[in-house]
């Protein structure tokens, strides 16, 4: 590894350990010429994931887009941003670990709705109304009735 101080092409590894999130290896190195120490990170190169949109266009997967959509759905709701970031990270890990090169926006949307439903039902309905493109009030009411029915069934089990 080239020394960032003197440019010498060789160094030795003094310490090597995984990062806190286990996504990279942190290495402390020492230049064999000037003796200065520096840190490098070794990380697996991720292949790009493409999202297939409803109109069959393809665009690069962007984890931040999931977070932005949930923030919008949770506007004026008592949902901490930390919770939304954790959900985003969980969905992102699921997508990346699936090793797929392409995923539909529908699959991502369903994952988001599944998580939002357990966090905040109002946010869930807001997200669903945009994601599922509710055409009129009847479609909206159908979703609310379904949610109410699920809640009743949940209460009966308890």
UniProtKB/Swiss-Prot annotation:
PROSITE patterns: ATP_CONE. Pfam families: ATP-cone (PF03477), Zn_ribbon_NrdR (PF22811). A zinc finger (unnamed) spans 3-34. One of its GO terms (molecular function) is DNA binding. Transmembrane segments: none annotated. Belongs to the NrdR family. This is Transcriptional repressor NrdR. The gene is nrdR.
């Amino acid at each position: 590894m080239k020394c960032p101080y003197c440019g010498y092409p060789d160094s030795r590894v003094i310490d090597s350990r995984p990062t806190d999130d286990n996504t990279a290896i942190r290495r402390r190195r020492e230049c064999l010429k000037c003796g200065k120490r520096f840190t490098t990170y070794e990380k697996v190169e991720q292949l790009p994931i493409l999202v297939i949109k409803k109109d069959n266009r393809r665009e690069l997967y962007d984890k931040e887009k999931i977070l932005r959509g949930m923030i919008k759905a949770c506007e004026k709701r008592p949902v901490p941003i930390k919770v939304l970031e954790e959900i985003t990270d969980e969905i992102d890990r699921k997508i990346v670990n699936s090793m797929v090169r392409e995923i539909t926006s529908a699959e991502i949307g369903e994952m988001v709705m599944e998580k939002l439903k357990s966090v905040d039902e109002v946010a869930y309905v807001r997200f669903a109304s945009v994601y599922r493109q509710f055409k009129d009030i009847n479609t909206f009411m159908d979703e609310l009735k379904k949610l109410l029915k699920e809640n009743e069934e949940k209460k009966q089990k308890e």
